[in-house]
Amino acid sequence: SKLLKYSASKNKPVAVLIKNKTIEQEISNKKNKKKNNLSRIFFIKKLLKSIKKQTKIVSTTGYTSRELFYLRENYTKLKGKDFYMVGGMGHSSMVSLGISINNQDVICLDGDGSMLMHMGSLRSIGFYNPKKFKHILLNNFCHESVGGQETMSKGIDFKKVIDAFGYKNYFSIKNKENTNLILKKFL
């Protein structure tokens, strides 16, 4: 209230600075990574080696887009046409749907936070059931790139969720060992 009055009277912006970990304690994904030995960058690299050259990738905000960009820039054989949704949290699936409706192969690399933020898009995807659309959920249980706050995705049965929205298939990769096999079935 005082800051708003000050801002209005002086016609100047104000800011409230909050110490790290004041609102919510950061969670660590190290335990989860050790448990299933599957990192996001490992998966993205495997995916890039498995897809057709003309396949477009739309990647969600944060580390997913940065890691995809890094892999594309540093491995010349993996160059492609990607759309990095940096700052567009929750919208990668709808952009991907639009691309697929134009009869183009597209993969959406989505995060659990992003997916939960715009669940209505899942119904549109299930309704249109585009044949050239592949939706990949990278569930790390947190908004990693903006401080690691929990997404509350623990306990959600995503198979039941996408079934309810009309998705036709569901595949789950739990560890490095089954990554290639599941990607082959999925793609």
Task: Label each residue range with its predicted role.
Residues 1-6, 42-46, 50, 70-187:
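Thiamine diphosphate
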Residues 56-78:
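Acidic-glycine-rich active-site phosphate/pyrophosphate-binding loop
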